[in-house]
UniProtKB/Swiss-Prot annotation:
Membrane topology, from the record: Multi-pass membrane protein
NCBIfam families for this protein: yidC_oxa1_cterm
PANTHER family given in the database record: CYTOCHROME C OXIDASE ASSEMBLY PROTEIN COX18, MITOCHONDRIAL, OXA1
GO terms of molecular function: membrane insertase activity
Name used for this protein in its record: Membrane protein insertase YidC 1
Annotated transmembrane regions: 58-78, 129-149, 171-191, 198-216, 222-240
Covalent lipid adducts (N-palmitoyl cysteine), residues: C26
Sorted UniProt keywords: Cell membrane, Chaperone, Lipoprotein, Membrane, Palmitate, Protein transport, Signal, Transmembrane, Transmembrane helix, Transport
Principal subcellular localization: membrane
Signal sequence extent: 1-25
Compartments, as annotated in UniProt: Cell membrane
An annotated GO BP: protein insertion into membrane
Organism: Streptococcus pyogenes serotype M6 (strain ATCC BAA-946 / MGAS10394)
Length: 275
């Protein structure tokens, strides 16, 4: 019973923490050096870092360099999150079998399901919450970076290439690029997933559209951040968690298993003929 309660408690915490982070980060007022809250100070620190990286006063260059720096620092966590999610996907068929086996709602059945699920996680070296920790660490960092671009006045000035960073891109090239890289990152993330679900498939197309239309009205500095961040994620996925290689390896193992079973059947037939 304690194991069941512990699992339920962990699930509740996993749901509440992101909500709390979002509520803490939802301020819209201008952030300055005199801002007193800890969150606003973090936002201002990020803004000063972007300003420091703005060579020749180009805030656009600062946004790009700081975004790349943050993404590089978070890369190990992102990689951990992806690998953990893949492991969870791999054991989903066995988890569903357990859920069918222990479909009852009584306490004893739920306890047995929790025990065997934990045994399955241990067998494959899977921590069901390992994919949540990197996300919880990344979330406040990325929100603080976003707010630095929207709430600190000195980051809303200047130009980069053809755009005024405080205005929307009148050529709409940045929203298009942001949408394209958002699509590629979500598509590549979902590509190697063994079991597709409707929600993920919908998000592959909905997220880029949301980014595209939001980019029409948002400051170009924010859209530039989205573009660079998602472009980095595409490259990162191709280098560290290439879905095409994962699919090819999965197919190779499946073919080897098929060949092994075929050899076993042939060996059994030969043994039967000799008898």
């Amino acid at each position: 019973m304690r194991k069941v309660l512990r699992v339920k408690k962990n699930i509740k915490i996993a749901r509440i923490v992101p909500l709390v982070l979002l509520l803490v980060a939802c301020g819209r007022g201008e952030v300055t050096a005199q801002s007193s809250s800890g969150w606003d100070q973090l936002v201002y620190l990020f803004a000063r870092a972007i300003q420091w990286l703005s060579f020749d006063g180009s805030i656009g260059v600062g946004i790009i360099l700081f975004t790349l720096t943050i993404r590089l620092m978070l890369m190990p966590l992102f990689n951990m999150q992806i690998k953990s999610s893949q492991k969870m996907q791999d054991i989903q068929p066995e988890l569903r079998e357990l859920q069918k086996k222990y479909a009852g709602k009584d306490t004893q059945t739920r306890m047995k399901l929790a025990e065997e699920s934990q045994a399955l996680y241990k067998k494959y070296g899977v921590n069901p919450y390992a994919s949540l920790l990197p996300l919880l660490i990344q979330m406040p960092v990325m929100i603080a970076l976003f707010q630095a671009l929207t709430r600190v006045s000195f980051l809303k000035t200047g130009t980069f290439l053809w755009v005024e960073l405080a205005q929307h891109d009148h050529l709409y090239l940045l929203p298009v690029l942001a949408a394209v890289f958002t699509f590629l990152s979500t598509w590549l993330t979902n590509l190697a997933t063994k079991e597709k679900n409707v929600m993920m498939t919908v998000m592959i197309y909905v997220m880029p559209l949301m980014i595209f239309f939001m980019g029409f009205n948002l400051a170009s500095g924010v859209v530039l951040y989205w573009t660079v961040s998602n472009a980095f994620q595409v490259v990162q996925l191709l280098l560290l968690n290439n879905p095409f290689k994962i699919i090819a390896e999965r197919q190779r193992l499946a073919n080897e298993e098929k060949e092994r079973r075929l050899r076993e059947r042939r060996a059994r037939k030969k043994a039967m003929k000799r008898k």
